[in-house]
Amino acid sequence: MIEATYSDRKSAVQILSKSFDSNKSVEYVIKGGPKRRTQIRALMEYAFDMCMLFGEVYISDDKKACALILLPYKKKLTLKSIELDIKILFFCSGIKKLSKVLKREEAIRDFHPENKYAHLWFLGVLPQEQRKGYGSKLLAELTASYSKRHLPVYLETSTRSNLPWYARHGFTLVKELRLGYSLFILKKDLTLYHAFARN
């Protein structure tokens, strides 16, 4: 995998926008309507920019998969982050959905740890390249990297059929949130080796 730079923004946003085109969790956040795909693209641009500020972005070597990771312990209020928040509010979610989105984020945070961790915000593969192992390879590389850095990995998915796939990669279910749809919070703890190495 390759750690992305801003020059990879267009490719990353394209991969994620196509991958999450019909995702329930994304639909919950955006305004919807005839401009829904523009809104999805705006959401992915926002997530990319936030992870470049307060996390990491990785693209597979073949440029077919992308992952956005937020490191919450690095997150802070800056003029840039405020600008991004305002932009996403007007171009993606809208005022009417603000309350729902904030309540969802608060509910998710209730099941995230107080200690340092990595939040796998988005992991996507180009639709025509799915089920070929590209996502599995990237996820395995990511979790191995964060395990070496002593960071458990948390993520959310609204795709029930993906739960067995995540389980094969060592993730366990933390909580199922009911938000008009099911949102599953998953985690992958440190391996025993890396847990002992940290102590």
What residue ranges belong to the model's regions?
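Conserved active-site alpha-helix within GNAT-family acetyltransferase domains
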Residues: 136, 148-150, 159-176, 180
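Conserved GNAT acetyl-CoA-binding A-motif
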Residues: 115-119, 146-158
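Conserved acyl-donor/pantetheine-binding loop and adjacent beta-alpha core of acyl/acetyltransferases
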Residues: 66-123, 130
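A short beta-loop-alpha structural element at the N-terminal edge
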Residues: 1-15, 22
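Conserved beta-strand-loop-alpha-helix junction that forms the acyl-donor binding cleft
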Residues: 121-130, 154-164, 179
